[in-house]
């Protein structure tokens, strides 16, 4: 029976012999594109929550994050997102219970996490009762997103040798950053456009001072 230090020495020697994968060579694998597209399509959701939630609270409820209630709401939001730390443990639980390999267990965990952000769809209707409801729901969505994101990062180690992990992770991070930038820009333009238009008899028209006053009469009747 070999001693542990001898086995470790063999592994270390084998790792040294691994040929490093070139940066451009990484793009020749479909797994790279799968990871990059996954980051491109999803990273913007996290930054959307972080960037627009304070504006949402101010616009919908008149709550500023510089005030006590605003600080409490934002603190609650971030505290809930910390649940994502536990999300990294779910694949291990699945492996222990089902015997699946790590990659398959991560895929199953990511499928579970993907459903949780749907609760954010209830933020707007429940917001009519209290600002705490949307904050809690957005926090749950953010926590699920970060759990999903942590697991997609881990899949890189499942699919590629150690010498390629840094390059593949960097490619995915770049794709996620570009996707996030595009989403925030599009969202901002959409908000500006929506605030300047309205619907009358099913037709889109430009918002005017008179229409704003008419709408205010319904919201705040005399």
Residue ranges and their predicted role:
Residues 103-151:
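C-terminal transmembrane helical hairpin of 12-TM major facilitator-type secondary transporters
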Residues 66-67, 162-171:
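Loop-to-transmembrane helix entry/capping segments in MFS-fold secondary transporters
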Residues 66-67, 102-108, 189-222:
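A membrane-interface helix-boundary motif in multi-pass transporters
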Residues 24-89, 125, 141-157, 180-188, ...:
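Extracytoplasmic gate region of multi-pass secondary transporters
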Residues 72-76, 137-138, 168, 172:
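Hydrophobic positions within alpha-helical transmembrane segments
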Residues 16-20, 33-37, 72, 108, ...:
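Alpha-helical membrane-protein architecture signal
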Residues 1-36, 60:
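Juxtamembrane intracellular "pre-TM" segments in multi-pass secondary transporters
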Residues 96-97, 156-165:
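Paired intracellular helix-loop junctions of major facilitator superfamily
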